[in-house]
Amino acid sequence: MESGKMAPPKNAPRDALVMAQILKDMGITEYEPRVINQMLEFAFRYVTTILDDAKIYSSHAKKPNVDADDVRLAIQCRADQSFTSPPPRDFLLDIARQKNQTPLPLIKPYAGPRLPPDRYCLTAPNYRLKSLIKKGPNQGRLVPRLSVGAVSSKPTTPTIATPQTVSVPNKVATPMSVTSQRFTVQIPPSQSTPVKPVPATTAVQNVLINPSMIGPKNILITTNMVSSQNTANEANPLKRKHEDDDDNDIM
């Protein structure tokens, strides 16, 4: 923007000539042409506002016309609102010094959120970790047990434990041969009186145990039971006694 000594044209309005003369009296000789228009607009708005306020004050005082006292009061009130400057620095320092001399109030113990007592607050862990017990490689394995007691006439029934789940690692086991073991137990029947030896037939009972329950080997338990053919003679001892008496008479 170019600036220089501006002179209003001779055919300019009277208000523009007056504003140019005011700027010249204040020592302002270089300005843009639009400055005069802005100053005229500002002066018109300011004068209109002052006259409106003076009219309000005059009507409040119940005066028939607006006089100079009303205009002075309106200018004084408008000057306090429109043309204000910040207070001096020394004045602000004095006010700040007086404020800082006043100690701050103590912090209240119940400041912040009102929490219940500590025993009702979940501010600490209320649980305990339980360590897991690791099972060894031999734990949980079933071991076959055979109990040998007194020989009786009744065959003993082997008891098998309840199968349990055993975790097997994902490894390929080496091939192994499955062998079977045979146990032969001969159980003679109980006799109260000596009798003559009579050929008897032997009944064999085989009991096969599942290998998955006891181990990699199959165990075959064989029980031999001697059945007597002269059960009728033992059941009727009087008849046998009569036969022996007849033999003695013949002799």
UniProtKB/Swiss-Prot annotation:
Q: Where in the cell is it found?
A: Nucleus
For whether the record's keyword set contains Transcription regulation, the answer is: yes
Question: What are the UniProt keywords, alphabetically?
Answer: Acetylation, Nucleus, Phosphoprotein, Transcription, Transcription regulation
Task: Locate the Phosphothreonine modifications and list their residues.
Answer: 159, 174
Q: Which InterPro entries match?
A: Histone-fold, TFIID-31, TFIID_subunit_9
| The protein's name in its UniProt record | Transcription initiation factor TFIID subunit 9B
Residues annotated as transmembrane: none
Instruction: Return the annotated region ranges for Disordered.
Output: 229-251
User: What are the GO BP annotations of this UniProt entry?
Assistant: DNA-templated transcription initiation; negative regulation of apoptotic process; negative regulation of intrinsic apoptotic signaling pathway in response to DNA damage by p53 class mediator; negative regulation of transcription by RNA polymerase II; positive regulation of cell growth; protein stabilization
